[in-house]
UniProtKB/Swiss-Prot annotation:
Membrane-crossing segments per the record: none
Cross-referenced InterPro entries: Ta0600-like_sf, UPF0147
Organism: Methanosarcina acetivorans (strain ATCC 35395 / DSM 2834 / JCM 12185 / C2A)
Family affiliation: Belongs to the UPF0147 family.
Listed name of the protein: UPF0147 protein MA_0092
């Protein structure tokens, strides 16, 4: 049995980034999210929008910050779920782009 490798095109990766930025924007406008979390989310948005860095590096940096803030005890549950979903989406971006 052979495994199929699914290649993600750069358009797919760009769409993942676009969708993640939309969710991140909604988190920053949610007043129930603590200010320190919103600051971190703004930092992630800046990282993802920085096109001078390779896409996989931007995704990895963002995932690292998302992991840190997902452990914050003051994070509302609905936001924690969004953050886990964002991490999962960013993990789909291939390293070789």
């Amino acid at each position: 049995m052979t495994a199929k490798v699914i290649q993600m095109s750069s358009n797919d990766s760009a769409e993942v980034i676009r969708q993640c930025l939309q969710v991140l924007d909604s988190i920053t406008s949610d007043s129930s999210v603590p200010r320190n979390i919103r600051r971190s989310v703004n930092e992630i948005m800046d990282i993802l929008n920085n096109e001078s860095e390779p896409l996989f590096l931007r995704a990895a940096s963002s995932i690292s910050i998302l992991e840190d803030i997902s452990n914050d005890p003051n994070l509302p549950l609905h936001t924690r779920t969004l953050i886990w979903n964002l991490s999962s989406q960013l993990e789909t971006i291939p390293v070789d782009e």
